[in-house]
């Protein structure tokens, strides 16, 4: 893809979801329910809006336990491709579980996502602090050709994509989330500084992306007024990890 006009930023609306961390599970679930209530309303009112649910079905399960009446709404958005779910049941630490656990995790998440309307066909692993050598083999055997990583990637990776190869020769294409899964989180915080921040993000990531659109991972919702901001800044569009890979 060759850049023909202004630089392009591909923005992925998403959340990174820790079920339990510095607060108990139920406190985090309150935030999850509030978030997805807003996401469902936004997606239903704007067919251009897409949202990625962190690659793990557990967030869907936790939400629907509180909002079972919204299952059909969630499924409709999954079927339309506006809500990207799976392929994992949970995001895992690859060194704390067995190899079979990793495979079963993927199997379960994949099946549950398909039952809801479709699985995101990306090995989404943004927050693992290291990766087992066989992970590309596991992903490839599952039929996944693409992955997204942030943590656990060697410092020597200086581009935005690379081939990740397992000992058996299996390989997947990795989109490296340079700057992390929130590298564009502050982009829309201040309307007066949108152009400045968008240009700064594009400039910071351009060396990695060359003539390709740069990838920005950011907060879940975009204020409607943002559409006009791009006139004085790099062109941008909302997308999903699958489209960005």
Where are these regions (language model features)?
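Catalytic-domain carbohydrate-binding cleft regions of carbohydrate-active enzymes
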Residues: 1-245
